[in-house]
């Protein structure tokens, strides 16, 4: 994935130097967590039920696009349980020994959070099966015919796994999670609440209409909303009086090249290439990526999900196709035969 993607203000991934700010804005409890009401209610029941029984909760799998709060929920789960949180990621667990060391250091009721759990190496995943199910691991000592397996007990713990690609998890791993929850994109009104909370923490004077303006350009993602808020704050402090009004927000987002729908330069380049260079498609993602000078994974994993959700691009067996909404967005007349959307637009029912 290209570095340009990581520098985009509308990227749902954490950018360089953003981690500390991101942590400061994280909610500390389910009560503080805004959005995802169904998931919050379900987690509240799981947590309170386990606390009432004095037991360790079932293992929890959180899935959904990046930037929606999966890591925040893992931290909240540990805090609500009064437990310690140990954090790692799938790519960091390359060998079974890496996982064995982490598991051996757990104490009873600890919460182990594995981000990007779909990327865990197979040897570590197979060790995780036994740890999740029986709270033990088998450590192989020696090599060849003389190797022996030594069982080691693991303190009862709760695994919280996070994934942006639930379909990439193996069946045996997925089946070992007692509770699974999918997190959806946020509604603009929910993002307004996220922005108001962040503004209070950061000491930013944010008008209600300005918050609504930023929210509707945030692609349904709290992390993007908080990032755009900081960009607008910079603009307001340098070119205005520090107060963020709707007009200030609109002027700032124009400077940062984020339009009314939350699309940026790369999104518009993809739509422009799809319509102008390929007549609206269908066209393969690799060919489309070459046309905009990006890697295919960037187009497929970064731009496309939002463009599909916004109703501007449709996936077909023959390739990507621009919908009538994409042509309208570009102020172009769609070819004869191009109809409406193959899926609802963003925030539409």
Curated annotation (Swiss-Prot):
Residues 260-349 are annotated as: Head domain (RuvB-H). Keywords: ATP-binding, Cytoplasm, DNA damage, DNA recombination, DNA repair, DNA-binding, Hydrolase, Nucleotide-binding. Residues 187-257 are annotated as: Small ATPAse domain (RuvB-S). GO terms for biological process: DNA recombination; DNA repair. One of its GO terms (molecular function) is ATP hydrolysis activity. ATP binds at residues 25-26, 67, 70-72, 133-135, 176, 186, 223. It comes from the Bacteria. It is found in: Cytoplasm. DNA binds at residues 315, 320. Its EC number is 3.6.4.-. It holds the Pfam family RuvB_N. The RuvA-RuvB-RuvC complex processes Holliday junction (HJ) DNA during genetic recombination and DNA repair, while the RuvA-RuvB complex plays an important role in the rescue of blocked DNA replication forks via replication fork reversal (RFR). RuvA specifically binds to HJ cruciform DNA, conferring on it an open structure. The RuvB hexamer acts as an ATP-dependent pump, pulling dsDNA into and through the RuvAB complex. RuvB forms 2 homohexamers on either side of HJ DNA bound by 1 or 2 RuvA tetramers; 4 subunits per hexamer contact DNA at a time. This is Holliday junction branch migration complex subunit RuvB. It comes from Mycobacterium leprae (strain TN). The lineage of its organism: Bacteria, Bacillati, Actinomycetota, Actinomycetes, Mycobacteriales.
């Amino acid at each position: 994935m290209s570095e340009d993607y990581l520098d985009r203000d509308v990227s749902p991934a954490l950018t360089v130097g953003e981690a500390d700010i991101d942590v400061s804005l994280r909610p500390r409890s389910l009560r503080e967590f805004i959005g995802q009401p169904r998931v919050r209610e379900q987690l509240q029941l799981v947590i309170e039920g386990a606390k009432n029984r004095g037991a360790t909760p079932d293992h929890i799998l959180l899935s959904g696009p990046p930037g929606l709060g999966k890591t925040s929920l893992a931290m909240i789960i540990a805090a609500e349980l009064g437990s310690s949180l140990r954090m790692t990621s799938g790519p960091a667990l390359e060998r079974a020994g890496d996982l064995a060391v982490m598991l051996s250091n757990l104490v009873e009721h600890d919460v182990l959070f594995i981000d990007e759990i779909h990327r865990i190496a197979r040897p570590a995943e197979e060790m995780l099966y036994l740890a999740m199910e029986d709270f033990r691991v088998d450590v192989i000592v020696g090599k060849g015919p003389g190797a022996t397996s030594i069982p080691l007990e693991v303190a009862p713990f709760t695994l919280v796994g996070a994934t942006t690609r639930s379909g990439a998890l193996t069946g045996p791993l997925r089946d070992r999670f007692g509770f699974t929850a999918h997190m959806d994109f946020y509604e603009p009104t929910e993002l307004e609440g996220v922005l108001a909370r962040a503004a209070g923490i950061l000491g930013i004077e944010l008008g209600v209409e300005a918050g609504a303006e930023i929210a509707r350009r945030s692609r349904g993602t709290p992390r993007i909303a908080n990032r755009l808020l900081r960009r607008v704050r910079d603009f307001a402090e340098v070119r205005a009086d520090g107060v963020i009004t709707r007009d200030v927000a609109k002027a700032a987002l124009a400077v940062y090249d984020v339009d009314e729908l939350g699309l940026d330069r790369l999104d518009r380049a993809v739509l422009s290439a799809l319509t102008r260079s390929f007549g609206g498609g269908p066209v393969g993602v690799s060919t489309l990526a070459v046309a905009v000078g990006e890697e295919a994974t960037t187009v497929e994993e970064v731009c496309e999900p939002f463009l599909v959700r916004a109703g501007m691009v449709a996936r077909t067996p023959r390739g990507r196709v621009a919908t009538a909404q994409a042509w309208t967005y570009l102020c172009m007349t769609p070819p004869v035969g191009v109809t409406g959307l193959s899926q609802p637009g963003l925030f539409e029912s």
